[in-house]
């Protein structure tokens, strides 16, 4: 699915993030599993990740990220009448995590629902929010990516425990001046690769003889090959739909899964690695939260300038993929509260 976009211009008005306090270093796993700091860092780029406290669910993390946004950008939540949360670790099947976030941030009464597309979820949620604003069904939308992945993985499994962390990020989207905002979206999925990355659900039906535990399971080799290919393909397609090429990218904001995947994308695009926003060394793979976390951090550091060409790209369970091209508007985002 692709979309090339025109008036009204809709873009990012505010950003926010939250990471739990507990820092889990590679040394933690080196003492428990057959691994080492060097092994993890050299293969993934991850040095540490955050784990949520027992009382920090995905809705709590999402609320705190939204509070961070509201503190940095006073008035940004005014007029928001749609809340979408991308998560694979919801508080419950229902009520939706989005509804709980809305209730905890003064947005009670706003339309609210969750999107579940694993690590691609934030891009899917962005596209849905964009479409609802374009259709006149919403004025402004709060899009949240929030995950407690530490509870979804087996902490004794070296193949997954070392990769994932907890956190939340969010954006408010709405109308921006012409020439700014989202230019294109590319989304897709192929269930043929579904068995390579899955997390058992409460109502899951399995073929006879299939073995699946309660935790996230990943075929790392196959997911890596898929990610390298689709991240590059979807990014090129999104830029093409926007009337651009990858040579026009000022900042790549990718899903934070593995530094090797990001390096491969940069090499393919001829983009210096310094122009890719990365924080997986400190947060690990936070699934649907990774792109908004990276956006919020880069914005706070003043890395994005007015008119910069951004490319957001991700991949995840499904197997799924997504990308979005946008022209950064530093209007509200350049006027955050100190």
Swiss-Prot record:
Signal peptide: none annotated. The active site is at residues 119, 255, 285. CDD domains: KAS_III. Its EC number is 2.3.1.180. Disulfide bonds: none annotated. Catalyzes the condensation reaction of fatty acid synthesis by the addition to an acyl acceptor of two carbons from malonyl-ACP. Catalyzes the first condensation reaction which initiates fatty acid synthesis and may therefore play a role in governing the total rate of fatty acid production. Possesses both acetoacetyl-ACP synthase and acetyl transacylase activities. Its substrate specificity determines the biosynthesis of branched-chain and/or straight-chain of fatty acids. This is Beta-ketoacyl-[acyl-carrier-protein] synthase III 2.
